[in-house]
């Protein structure tokens, strides 16, 4: 991990996002790019929120960059001297598109971002336009909900659908978990008692164990009539402080697992950060590893 991108919208949970990004940069010796993207038409719709700038491309961009620096120094304090930080601000009609472009431009290895409030965060998960950041980003996305508290992750839950891409996602997750010596809880919850096959689950566990050499890897296969209630319960019982998922292009992870009304009742989704891997990133990662192995031979 060399470059971490923090998309900062000055929301209420920016402090947590900054703290996490700083700690990760310290552990990986990564460079931190803090970017702010805004749509000038949206700002001008409420001119009382911004001062008058005759030169939008110059003065307003510099003002936003200065605001980024001041906020970062106030939160990071002494840690600000331990990492390399680059501050940039951009004007774009599509905030999500600009973020994706900058992740690619800076060759980002991780994107950290937050959501303003509970409602926006849940919409972020189950079908808003902003979800394109998760599904299209060429690196993992760390999402901080508004009600989250800052904790270095030591207990990570990987919500598995037993898909073929789960192994590659777990490889990526282990590289993060090792930094914090964190436990990984791989869980799969089924509502279908008839199709629930213990043999299939054991085969999945064996395959994962053979593929991934990490001593703090735990597997749980559970039956429940209510997936979201069981997930909430599991998070509380095991003091989970990071939830991981694989995002698919055809349908949101949470759209596939839950009905919309059920998601809005999940307490853990508004309190615990998410680490999201999408299929584009996992394919890219798999090819990169294959190329590296070929070069060794």
Regions found by a protein language model. Give the residues of each.
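A short acidic, glycine-rich active-site loop
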Residues: 53-67
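Small/aliphatic-rich secondary-structure junction motif
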Residues: 1-54, 155-220, 240-243, 269, ...
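Short beta-strand elements of ligand-binding domains
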Residues: 113-115, 140-146, 246, 274-278
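Short glycine-rich, flexible loops that bind phosphorylated cofactors or substrates
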Residues: 13, 119-120, 165, 251-253
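Acidic (E/D-rich), amphipathic helical modules within compact regulatory domains
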Residues: 109-125
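Charged helix-capping and loop-helix junction motifs
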Residues: 126-129, 200-204, 257-263
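Structural beta-alpha unit
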Residues: 73-111, 212-263, 272, 279-290, ...
